[in-house]
């Protein structure tokens, strides 16, 4: 089992570290073997408005990268397929250059309006069928060697609420080294009545009970908790919500709402270690959203399995 810290090549993340060795010392000090990298546009303190390819980021060396998280598009089903292929191949090529052992791909379809209003336009199975077809277009005939791990969210797509949906996704995807990346916090969003981490662990065990035959396919875990059911209930009670007409303002309020929902905080309940042991994945990524290097260090220590 390998342990990763999530990291992006964005300005907010890279400016926390002074060099590749500084970054390496940091994640090793906090119990990680390497990084799960999302290759976003790279910029520096000296020129924050100049965006460069992720591959030029000097902080990240190939021997530091265990996994690559694709820069996933949540609203994609009506977009041009050739452009989508180009978008994702760029990330897959980055993963290949870095020697990544796995990549992560979101199986979801949601637009800004849906995430804001909760009025969904597709069923889980519709999204799963479309995603499987697209994944086959993306991967068929290629010579990739990494695991292709499909991640759950709480919007239409792979949610782990129905084992038949997960089985259908696996069955339809041709790629041999396929599996799941279970995001624990994302799954918790499917139950708005959870109020503490012990209940969250029990909820995840119940999901595993329902997916027993699929547990061997869970090759990775994004280990985090996000108990925001009360926020979601209040949001729904205050409906209807209308998006601003201005695109920039609309983008801002949607993501402000999403970050209130999906907090990515340390999962520290006593039962978390047993949950991970039950799944026995190849990879565990401590996937957090933090505001500083100091907060990231605090989160990594709190969520570190050996400290629970």
Question: What residue spans do the PLM features occupy?
Answer:
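Acidic-and-aromatic substrate-binding clefts and catalytic sites of carbohydrate-active enzymes
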Residues: 10-21, 37-52, 74-85, 113, ...
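Alpha-helix-loop-beta-strand connector modules within alpha/beta enzyme cores
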Residues: 54-71, 127-143, 173, 211, ...
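N-terminal pre-domain/capping segments
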Residues: 1-96, 306
């Amino acid at each position: 089992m390998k342990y990763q810290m999530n990291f992006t090549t964005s300005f907010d993340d890279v400016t926390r570290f002074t060099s590749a060795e500084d970054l390496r010392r940091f994640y090793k000090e906090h119990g990680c073997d390497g990084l799960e990298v999302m290759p976003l546009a790279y910029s520096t303190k000296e020129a924050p408005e100049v965006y460069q390819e992720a591959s030029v980021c000097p902080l990240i060396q190939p021997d530091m990268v265990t996994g690559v998280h694709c820069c996933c598009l949540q609203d994609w089903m009506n977009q041009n397929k050739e452009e989508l292929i180009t978008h994702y191949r760029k990330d897959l090529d980055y993963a290949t250059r870095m020697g990544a052992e796995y990549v992560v791909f979101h199986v979801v379809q949601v637009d800004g309006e849906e995430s804001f209003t909760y009025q969904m336009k597709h069923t889980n199975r519709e999204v799963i069928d479309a995603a499987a077809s697209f994944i086959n277009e993306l991967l068929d005939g290629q010579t990739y060697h990494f695991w292709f791990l499909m991640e759950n969210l709480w919007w239409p797509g792979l949610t782990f609420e129905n084992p038949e949906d997960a089985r259908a996704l696996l069955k339809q995807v041709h790629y041999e080294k396929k599996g799941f990346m279970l995001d624990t916090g994302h799954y918790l969003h499917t139950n708005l009545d959870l109020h503490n981490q012990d209940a969250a662990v029990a909820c995840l065990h119940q999901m595993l009970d329902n997916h027993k035959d699929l547990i061997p396919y869970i090759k990775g875990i994004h280990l985090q908790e996000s108990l925001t059911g009360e926020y979601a209930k209040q949001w729904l009670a205050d409906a209807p919500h209308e998006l601003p007409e201005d695109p920039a303002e609309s983008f801002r309020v949607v993501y402000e709402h999403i970050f209130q929902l999906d907090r990515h905080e340390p999962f520290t309940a006593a039962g978390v270690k047993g949950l991970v042991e039950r799944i026995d994945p190849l990879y565990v990524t401590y996937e957090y959203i933090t505001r500083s290097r100091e907060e990231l260090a605090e989160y990594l220590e709190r969520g570190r399995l050996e400290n629970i």
